[in-house]
Design a protein with these regions (language model features):
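Local sequence-structure signature of Cys/Sec-based thiol-disulfide redox active-site neighborhoods
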Residues: 57-67
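Short alpha-helix boundary/capping elements
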Residues: 64, 78, 138-141
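Post-cleavage N-terminal segment of exported redox proteins
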Residues: 1-53, 97-141
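Short cysteine/histidine-rich zinc-coordinating motifs and their immediately flanking basic loops
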Residues: 82-89
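Short glycine/proline- and charge-enriched loop/turn segments
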Residues: 90-95
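The canonical Cys-X-X-Cys-His
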Residues: 66-78, 133
Length: 141
């Protein structure tokens, strides 16, 4: 039986596209993946004893050096939408339970922790702080 070469090429492209989609979805991350990363980093400190949702909540709601808190933009309930304190730009809910797209991309997680910690706290957040915040956000229903 003779096959048409264009059919073979077409089937090959479909298989490549499917493999790409599988690879992409296999690379999708979850909040728990970031917790593992933060924990590995935090364990470099011999005093690390684990993350705390309560410490994360306190940090999230505490006003820091620039008179802002995380809650200034993300609200005291991170399961609801917020808005930027200066620009009033809408911000989707931060809690993964309310917004499943949160904490699924290393690029975005790194970008937003870097930017927001510098803006709100005036410095880079520690792995302990990041883990506490994420533990808190994962506990919000």
């Amino acid at each position: 039986m003779r096959r048409n070469s264009s059919t073979g090429i077409f089937l090959g492209l479909i298989l490549l596209g499917t493999a790409g989609a599988v690879t992409e979805s296999a690379l999708a991350e979850a909040p728990a993946d970031f917790l593992k990363t933060f924990e590995a980093e935090a364990r470099q400190d011999k005093d690390f004893t684990g993350f705390s949702a309560e410490r994360g909540r306190a940090f999230f709601q505490q006003t820091h050096g620039s008179d802002w808190s995380c809650a200034s933009c993300h609200t005291k309930n991170p399961a609801v939408a917020g808005k930027h304190a200066k620009t009033s730009k809408p911000i989707k809910p931060l809690a993964p339970s309310a917004n499943p797209e949160r904490f699924t991309s290393t690029r975005k997680v790194d970008k937003w922790f870097r930017r927001n910690c510098n803006d709100v706290v005036g410095r880079t957040c520690t792995p302990q702080e990041k883990g506490d915040i994420l533990t808190y956000l994962m506990s919000v229903k």
